[in-house]
């Protein structure tokens, strides 16, 4: 349970399926569940999601199945080694037009996850989050629910720094 779902699995054993190291199967399985009216949430490390690109494209995206991808270990993950860096999912998911959310703190993560699970939300969509807790400095800013936030704004500044999610 590298994605931290052991508590959910224990609490909801009939709603949790561990397919092991079979990302392609996980995505196709989720597409099948979605085709029958369920709302599956597929939790996969970012670096391993690329293994299932064909299934994401053909089984989920082209059919516009109602699947939520929870992309764990997104961004730079130094402690996991060079093979586990989660840096490619924004490129290959945006290529097929899948909405991708990258909250910068826990409040935004909670907000967007609830939004993605609402009944009115349809089609494939994804939310990515880093390994571990949130950046303590960003935690003080709260969640506006907007598409962007100004974390620090100075009149007359000579430079602009743009950040994606919690990475700077």
Regions found by a protein language model. Give the residues of each.
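Thiamine diphosphate
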Residues: 1-124, 133-135, 145
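Structural motif
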Residues: 45, 130, 163-166
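All-alpha helical catalytic cores of prenyl diphosphate-utilizing isoprenoid enzymes
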Residues: 127
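Flexible inter-domain linker/hinge segments
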Residues: 138-140
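Long hydrophobic segments that form regular secondary structure
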Residues: 121, 143-168
